[in-house]
Design a protein with these regions (language model features):
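Beta->alpha loop/short-helix hinge microenvironment recognizer with preference
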Residues: 1-186
């Protein structure tokens, strides 16, 4: 709740007044929550700048892997299993598209909420637009420049890999849940 109320009247505030000209400005208090984009925007920018120094001089692609809301209950009750499977399925999908003997790379970060602060598990991945082949040579991916891999094909592979990981987990999941997951586009 504090994040929603950040820099609003709900958290109080103070009045700044200029002794010289009489200008008055109301400033509302921040929530100081480490997850708040208003309070932590400068830290986010610092993180981005630090990551930019680590980048190779190659094209990069932003790829997002999302879980359908049918899995929200499981994400709340078994987060380690659900999120481990999310990262693993994403990585296995990238590996599947770069080829068996090639080495890809990826930086990924978990977000568990959406823009409206509701539960929406997904990971943002920054993936180099290429790979190192079996001889240690860098190869650019064959892409149209807009997408690293075909989106629909990648979605289907990701869904299959994620569901396979759920099936092998120690969670008891009804078959109807798996049926529902395969009926949806991911």
């Amino acid at each position: 709740r504090a994040i929603k109320d950040c820099r609003t009247l709900a958290l109080g505030g103070h009045v700044d007044a200029c002794d010289s000209c009489g200008h008055i400005q109301i400033s509302y208090n921040s929530c100081r929550n480490r997850h708040c984009p208003k309070c932590q925007g400068h830290k986010r920018q610092q993180w981005i700048e630090a990551r930019e120094t680590e980048l190779l001089p190659v094209p990069y692609f932003h790829v997002v892997f999302t879980l359908p809301d049918d899995l929200n209950g499981l994400a709340l009750h078994k987060p380690k299993i659900i999120y481990d499977a999310l990262f693993r399925a994403a990585w296995e999908t990238v590996e599947a598209f770069t080829g068996k003997h090639n080495k890809a790379g990826m930086i990924s970060i978990l977000h568990t909420w959406g823009q409206n602060l509701s539960l929406h598990p997904h990971i943002h991945c920054i993936i180099p637009g290429g790979f190192v082949d079996r001889n240690g040579i860098w190869k650019l991916s064959k892409t149209d420049g807009k997408f690293l891999f075909p989106v629909k094909a990648m979605s289907k592979v990701y869904r299959a890999k994620y569901v396979a990981l759920l099936r092998t987990s120690d969670m008891e999941i009804e078959q109807s849940t798996f049926d529902t997951l395969f009926k949806k586009e991911w």
